[in-house]
Amino acid sequence: KNSEFDDKLVYGCAYASSLASGGKNITKVFESECLKRFDDSFVESVKSTVAIMSLNNVWYKFRDAMPNNEMKMAPQRMRVNIMRDYAGLDKILFETFSLCISAVNGCNFCIKSHTELLLENGKSKDYIYNIGRIASIVVAASKIESID
């Protein structure tokens, strides 16, 4: 057992990844597991994090695809107030879920940003890699679900 990875982190990352990947059945499973282990506010916080990070991920991928530097610097101009209080989560948990969601959504800008923040706050490279592994496994399971 990895002491850095408690149930809240593992199930939260798995739930966030399933929501971001769109796998309906696996999302139901992880939501049920989260509700058994944690309170409703945790589930709502994960959902809020997925919503805001999906908005950010689409915007930053869109902006980074622009043909010139001026357009790549365009301001977002969308309210993301929920990030001020980390969607009701601990800062590190919020950043961890945000990294997981950004990996699922393929946003390089956000992956780099959240990784840097986690490293600056003492998280190890292995911690970062394991977040990517959780996201990868859940996305793979979601893809299999869509085949059936």
Predicted regions and their residues:
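Hydrophobic alpha-helical segments
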Residues: 1-148
